[in-house]
Amino acid sequence: MKLVVDASAIAALYVPEERSEQAERAVSQAQELHTLDLAAYEVANDLWKHARRGLLREDEASNMLEELWEFFKALKVHSYAEVLKDAFALALKHGVTVYDAAYVALAEKIGGKLLTLDRQLAEKFPALVTP
């Protein structure tokens, strides 16, 4: 299965949360992993927030960023430019952010499923989201 992994799912692989195991399981079962280039910035920003709030030490966040970089090497990383127009249309139609809609547009484009831990996004696109 082709799987598009959004920033929320990638972040859960590094910063444990209640649905981290779900993300790990889906990633391990996928035949192809895809994401958008913007995911690196989104996840790095999430690590930064955790460090700023004292939930992670700065060295922990930096180490996680290095691990994230290695993980991205195993992904097929797509440019936002590939899906921007479709993402914008989906965002307007479904009332989600263009950021979130971009992952949906990528899943549609490659004929894959979307792994997201964003419940609102999953509810808006249940046919595309992997459980």
From Swiss-Prot:
- Can you tell which superkingdom this protein's organism belongs to? Archaea
| Enzyme Commission code | 3.1.-.-
UniProt note on regulation of activity: Inhibited by EDTA.
- Is the keyword Repeat in the record? no
**Needed co-factor(s):** Mg(2+)
Q: In Gene Ontology terms, what is one molecular function of this protein? A: RNA nuclease activity
| Record-linked InterPro entries | PIN-like_dom_sf, PIN_dom, PIN_Pae0151-like, TypeII_TA_RNase_PINc/VapC, VapC_family
Q: Which Pfam families match?
A: PIN
Recorded hits in Gene3D superfamilies, A to Z, give: 5'-nuclease
Question: Is the keyword Transcription regulation assigned to this protein?
Answer: no
Arranged from A to Z, the UniProt key words for this protein are:
Hydrolase, Magnesium, Metal-binding, Nuclease, Toxin-antitoxin system
> What are the binding positions for Mg(2+) in this chain?
6, 100, 118
- Give start and end of each PINc domain: 4-121
Q: Which PANTHER family does this entry report, sorted A to Z?
A: EXONUCLEASE VAPC9, RIBONUCLEASE VAPC3
Q: How does it assemble?
A: Homodimer. Forms a complex with putative antitoxin VapB3, possibly VapB(2)-VapC(2).
State the function annotated in the UniProt record: Toxic component of a type II toxin-antitoxin (TA) system. Has ribonuclease activity.
HAMAP family associated with the record: VapC_Nob1
Q: What family, per the record? A: Belongs to the PINc/VapC protein family.
List the protein's name. Answer: Ribonuclease VapC3
Gene that encodes it: vapC3
